[in-house]
Amino acid sequence: MKAVHFGAGNIGRGFIGYILSDNNIDVTFADVNEEIINALDNEGAYNVILANEEKTTTRVTGVSAINSGQLSDELKQAILEADIITTAVGVNILPIIAKSFAPVLKEKENHVNIVACENAIMATDTLKEAILDITGPLGDNIHFANSAVDRIVPLQKNDNILDVMVEPFFEWVVEKDAWYGEELEHIKYVDDLTPYIERKLLTVNTGHALLAYAGRFYGRDTVLDAVKDEAIVADLRQVLGETSEYIVDNFSFTKEEQAAYVEKIIGRFENPYLSDEVTRVGRGTIRKIGPKDRIIKPLSYLYENNLRRKGLLKAAALLLKYDDMNDKETIEMREYIDAHGVKAFLQEYAKINDRLADEIVAVYEDL
């Protein structure tokens, strides 16, 4: 089997490409980073290093790379031959990469699974929409499967530009009914993807966000520094207890299953061999205060059902206190708050009602 993976960054190489290669699939990376593309083409291999005491290392071999800046004959041929097309580029980039290969799908004769592996809900639907806007209706040999992916890959600098360190844990879940053909190892195929997407978003992403914003507020430089602070961990556990209420109420996970999942996630945050700067995890504040995102979505549910929400109120307030002037969204947030106030910002960007906004503002002013 052959795969084309768009996005030769750390997630692409250390997670998606690694899993595909482990299934004996020939992987061609497509990217616009000339340095990475040239290195992959020259070496045809790279190391994936686990963030554990042993630094367990796996050599990923038999890979190639193509510049995807424009539709070349080489990229066209790779798409025509591909059995799987995956992405890890950021959901906002999906419409851009769609332009680089969508027209070729009209010419494909073999079946292909297209899976967007992004940190966003139903990202493959976003990619599919962008593709169909270009191509119009496609044949029934083109299959779009949504997925949920989870693996922490921190910012890093390695001696070899291609080597990548990743946490030992990973989860890749794919819609079973939308997938065509043989199921792959290390991927969980499920009938309903939504519970897994929501559980990950409202446990991993919400927890990570709380650690970043609390860490920044209380003077901690890294997520690991934050998770060593007992007061911050108490806030973390309170927040994840509250998001667990939402998850258990809305999906088939039991309280015991969700509690075990929370402990596993906190254990990942505590990994001493894996840490991220709070400024990397915290960036993108306007997106992260959105009504369907990691803080406001569960908070709104708890508010509407008159359930405990003290932790999430503080998480929202800490986000509003975030002050990284190297992040465009945070600059926009700070400027809006300075001009119009916190409540107006929440009404504009979080789309919440006056009373819930007032609850957040009260906590914000007490910090």
Swiss-Prot record:
Gene source species: Staphylococcus haemolyticus (strain JCSC1435)
Protein's UniProt keywords contain RNA-binding: no
Residues at which NAD(+) binds: 3-14
EC number per UniProt: 1.1.1.17
Key words of the record: NAD, Oxidoreductase
MF annotations from Gene Ontology: mannitol-1-phosphate 5-dehydrogenase activity
Biological process (GO), any one: mannitol catabolic process
Matching Gene3D superfamilies: N-(1-d-carboxylethyl)-l-norvaline Dehydrogenase, domain 2, NAD(P)-binding Rossmann-like Domain
GO CC annotation terms, alphabetical: cytosol
PANTHER family attached to this UniProt entry: ALTRONATE OXIDOREDUCTASE-RELATED, MANNITOL-1-PHOSPHATE 5-DEHYDROGENASE
Protein name as it appears in the record: Mannitol-1-phosphate 5-dehydrogenase
Keyword Oxidoreductase: yes
Catalysed reaction, written as an equation: D-mannitol 1-phosphate + NAD(+) = beta-D-fructose 6-phosphate + NADH + H(+)
Family in the record: Belongs to the mannitol dehydrogenase family.
Entry-linked InterPro entries: 6-PGluconate_DH-like_C_sf, 6PGD_dom2, Mannitol_1_phos_5_DH, Mannitol_DH, Mannitol_DH_C, Mannitol_DH_CS, Mannitol_DH_N, NAD(P)-bd_dom_sf
